[in-house]
């Protein structure tokens, strides 16, 4: 079918003037929208429709607050049975329609429409004409089917004491929109450059224009049912004269980030905004080997403090790590880690992968059991093929509660009742071994 023509007179919707729009987005696929509206009402009880509503609106969250007590809202419904060709044809079963084809026009009562053909009954001759949908250029309908809507619509039943314009506030929750933080860190010898972004994903079914934007970081409890590549530089495309900046502050038990400019968040858009300016953060690289494991893990450790070059609350998100390839001075990806919501002065420990040139193996030399105890002799061999010395934390953890380490070849720290940490320095291009006996009693 090449086209659909509807001969219909539309009812005028409520005259709404939007201003001062507020959008607060949460981490858990939820957002709160608030706006001021102006209604032009007649005296008495009436129906009015509010268009441009998200398809994912949480209908039970809609709040309507008139500025004048002379307006009262009695009932509302959310209309999402949107107009399209197939639904209209189903509504017109048993009614007269007109089909326009290259061979002429066909008029009659629509008996069926299966998508491939129209069945039209000529009531004067009682003939049934079957017209192929592929031959139809236009379908002419006498009017829009009742209770059909072009867009998702809130329909209100309300009353006003007198005709006139009334101010009100409208707010609601919607699903389908969320935000996340993403970080890019370029590692140097002792510090890294941290580039932080906010990514907003809008699948709510509505464009949010010129909104005052706030982001809430933290796990907000609700009863609602249930990455795109970043540039390594500070590139940012904005229409305003200045770069938008998020202002962060504590809010209840959460953190709130307020953008200092208004923003457009369009439907089916993934929008990225800078969270913080570039930060240079001091860090240490840590190597960890779990006794019995197959590899040595690499960790990036830093403290979220001002003295350390950071000192800002960090929303949870992925941290992409890069290192500079000195042969051509370009950043190369070396790993990704997940950071949780991180408060000020909190220690951060992120695993970015396994070391290639630092190798470890565990050898169980001897095991014996007697008198409600078991002794196991371990030898840990470490090899460092790097050009510089490294320190490896060798960790032995046992689920037993009565665990002892006997005859260790080097000193160790006891992290808890059953976890022991040996810090082993391995020379560049060299090897190092440690031995100890583990005794478990019961």
Kindly give the residue locations of the regions a language model identified:
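Long, intrinsically disordered, low-complexity accessory segments associated with secretion
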Residues: 3-4, 15-442
């Amino acid at each position: 079918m090449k086209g659909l023509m509807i001969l219909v007179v539309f009812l005028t919707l409520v005259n709404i003037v939007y201003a001062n729009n507020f959008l607060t987005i949460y981490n858990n696929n939820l957002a709160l929208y608030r706006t001021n509206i102006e209604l032009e009402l007649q005296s008495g009880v009436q129906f009015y429709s509010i268009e441009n509503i998200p398809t994912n609106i949480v209908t039970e969250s809609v709040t309507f607050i008139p500025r004048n007590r002379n307006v009262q809202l009695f009932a509302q419904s959310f209309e999402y049975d949107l107009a399209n060709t197939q639904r209209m044809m189903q509504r017109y079963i048993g009614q007269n329609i007109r089909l326009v084809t290259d061979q002429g026009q066909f008029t009659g009562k629509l008996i069926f429409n299966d998508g491939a053909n129209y069945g039209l009954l000529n009531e004067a001759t009682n003939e049934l004409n079957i017209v192929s949908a592929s031959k139809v250029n236009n379908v002419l309908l006498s009017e829009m089917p009742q209770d059909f809507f072009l867009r998702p619509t809130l329909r209100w039943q309300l009353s006003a004491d007198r005709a006139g314009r009334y101010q009100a506030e409208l707010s609601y929750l919607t699903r389908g929109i969320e935000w996340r933080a993403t970080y890019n860190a370029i590692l140097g010898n002792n510090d890294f450059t941290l580039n932080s972004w906010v990514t907003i994903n809008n699948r709510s079914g509505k464009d949010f224009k010129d909104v005052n934007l706030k982001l809430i970081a933290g796990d907000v409890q609700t009863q609602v049912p249930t990455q795109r590549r970043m540039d390594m530089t500070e590139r940012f495309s904005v229409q305003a004269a200045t770069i938008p900046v998020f202002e962060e502050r504590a809010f209840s038990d959460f953190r709130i980030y307020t953008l200092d400019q208004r923003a457009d968040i369009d439907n089916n858009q993934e929008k990225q905004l800078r969270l913080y300016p570039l930060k240079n953060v001091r860090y240490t690289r840590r190597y960890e080997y779990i006794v019995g494991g197959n590899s040595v893990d690499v960790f990036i450790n830093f403290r979220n403090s001002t003295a350390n070059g950071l000192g800002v609350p960090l929303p949870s998100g992925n941290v992409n790590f890069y290192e500079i390839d000195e042969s051509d001075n370009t950043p190369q990806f070396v790993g990704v880690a997940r950071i949780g919501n991180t408060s000020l002065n909190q220690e951060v420990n992120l695993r970015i992968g396994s070391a290639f040139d630092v190798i470890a193996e565990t050898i169980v030399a001897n095991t014996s059991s007697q008198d409600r105890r078991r002794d196991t002799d371990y030898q840990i061999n470490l090899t460092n093929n790097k050009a510089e010395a490294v320190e490896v934390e060798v960790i032995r953890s046992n689920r037993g509660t009565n665990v002892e380490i006997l005859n260790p070849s080097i000193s160790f720290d006891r992290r808890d009742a059953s976890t022991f940490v040996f810090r082993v320095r391995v020379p560049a291009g060299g090897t190092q071994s440690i031995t100890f006996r583990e005794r478990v009693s019961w």
